[in-house]
């Protein structure tokens, strides 16, 4: 039966399994990877709902900036294995730092060097 579930449903089942014991914190590793935008948005809404309804702290590791901005109260931006920036999504978006701006604008060749 699990093989007949859609990717989005498998993610939802994984979330249900993760919260069944009412943890105080859940670590999500690329929770929207491989999902179409509509399903990814529903997973992000579910994560936000769990944060609000159950007071669960969520640590989300993602390369998907839309998802990061959708679910985050705080963002830590890592560069070369270190926290390069930490703040709110708005503070990240408004940052004038060239490395961050290049990343947000998709000019990844700067941060890959």
Model-assigned labels for residue ranges:
Residues 15:
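Hydrophobic anchor residue at the start of the ABC signature
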Residues 22:
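Conserved catalytic motifs of ABC-family nucleotide-binding domains
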Residues 26-29:
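Catalytic Walker B motif of ABC-type/P-loop ATPase nucleotide-binding domains
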